[in-house]
A protein has these predicted regions:
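Ligand-binding face of N-terminal immunoglobulin V-set domains in extracellular IgSF glycoproteins
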Residues: 4
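Conserved PDZ fold ligand-binding element
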Residues: 9-34
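C-terminal "post-core" interaction segments
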Residues: 73, 78-356
Length: 356
């Protein structure tokens, strides 16, 4: 059982649980083979009671964490100042997200007149309501399509467009994503990227771009049937399903996160599931590779390099050609470079051939 995204300010989030961590044991009992509902039942309990969970993470020893159960209060939007810039964090997309985002942007503008840009952090945001994703995208756009929803028939298309009124007045915007960003997060990132409203920084998102419809059986007496009825497409016509949103600047948050992306046996995405719906456009998700920029062993692990780089992009006015060089503690690799263990071997090369 893999963690999709730990909730902000939850016991697991505060304990350092990350997207992609695998739950291997709960209170000493092996969790292998348990269903989602069975794992949820074991994790739930009385407020104040503790549960011991063992997590597996790539390249590290099993980690045992004691979590104290509490009521989880979901705050959809938070924000703070980062120097001359505003930082906006959306943890989930619910019925309050649009209103909370508007209030947070206005508060930051009052606290710091003359703001020079915003970072919109959607990392480890597993999604939520479509309407909330549309509201968030619309908050940063003056016009243009946000997303389209397409069914099996050619004429079965529903389009959603922005209304006039960019709450930030067109200030430079950076969207942060990673492999824990899914569904509604991908709709927002895809819209703002395709409409050239934002620069996307981080790692390729999860790739959850399908629409499910729930059909009650006998009025709900016999349960319900959930079927996939459509796919989401970005304004440029790209399917989100299985492919995800690729960043304009690929940056890993930590050395450990870079290892996850480069691991041949681990692709944290919708594409990793054998039963996942195809993208429908023939495109494929990029396989394991070395992230373009990743912290090295000497990088301060308490720092958030992805956020640092997002702020660098804002300082460059959103122009990647003017971006400051990565610091010495960052490993910079050519985009798309495969890790040594997954690189293709040229079988036609002579035995005495040596690499350049």
């Amino acid at each position: 059982m893999k963690v999709i995204s730990p909730m902000d300010d939850s016991p697991a989030g505060r304990a350092g649980v990350q997207a992609g961590d695998v739950i291997s044991a709960i209170d000493g009992q092996n969790a292998a083979g348990l269903t989602v509902s069975e794992v949820s039942e074991k994790l739930r309990g009385a407020i104040g009671a503790s549960v011991t969970v063992t997590f597996l993470r790539d390249g590290e020893e099993p980690r045992e964490v004691v979590l104290v159960r509490e009521v989880i209060k979901v705050e959809s939007v938070t924000g703070r100042l980062e120097g001359d810039f505003g930082y906006l964090r959306i943890s989930t997309f619910n019925e309050n997200t649009g209103r909370e985002l508007t209030e947070t942007i206005e508060r930051l503008k009052r606290e710091k007149p003359g703001l020079k840009g915003f970072v919109l952090d959607l990392r480890n945001n597993g999604g939520g309501l479509l309407n909330a994703a549309i509201d968030v995208s619309d908050a940063f756009m003056e016009r243009g399509e946000i997303v389209s929803q397409r069914g099996r028939k050619p004429d079965d298309i529903e389009r959603y467009a922005a209304k006039p009124g960019d709450l930030t007045g067109g200030l430079p915007l950076v969207v942060l994503i990673n492999y824990g960003s899914a569904s509604a997060s991908e709709i927002v990132a895809g819209a703002l990227k395709d409409q050239e409203r934002a620069t996307v920084v981080g790692l390729t998102s999860f790739g959850k771009g399908s629409v499910q419809t729930v059909i009650p059986l006998r009025g709900g007496q016999d349960g319900a049937l959930s079927i996939t009825t459509a796919r989401y497409y970005t304004p440029s016509g790209r399917s989100i399903q299985k492919i995800g949103i690729e960043p304009d600047l690929e940056v890993a948050r930590s050395e450990a996160e870079a290892r996850i992306v480069s691991r041949s046996s681990f692709i944290y995405s919708e594409a990793a599931y054998a039963t996942a719906l195809d993208s429908s456009i023939g495109a494929e998700r990029k396989g394991p590779h070395t992230p373009h920029e990743a912290p090295g062993k000497d990088f301060d692990k308490t720092k958030d390099y992805q956020l640092q780089r997002a702020l660098d992009v804002l300082r460059a006015g959103g122009d990647l050609s003017k971006l400051a060089a990565a610091p010495d503690t960052i490993v910079v690799t050519a985009p798309g470079t495969k890790p040594v263990e997954t690189a293709e071997v040229d079988t036609d090369a002579p035995d005495d051939a040596t690499p350049d």
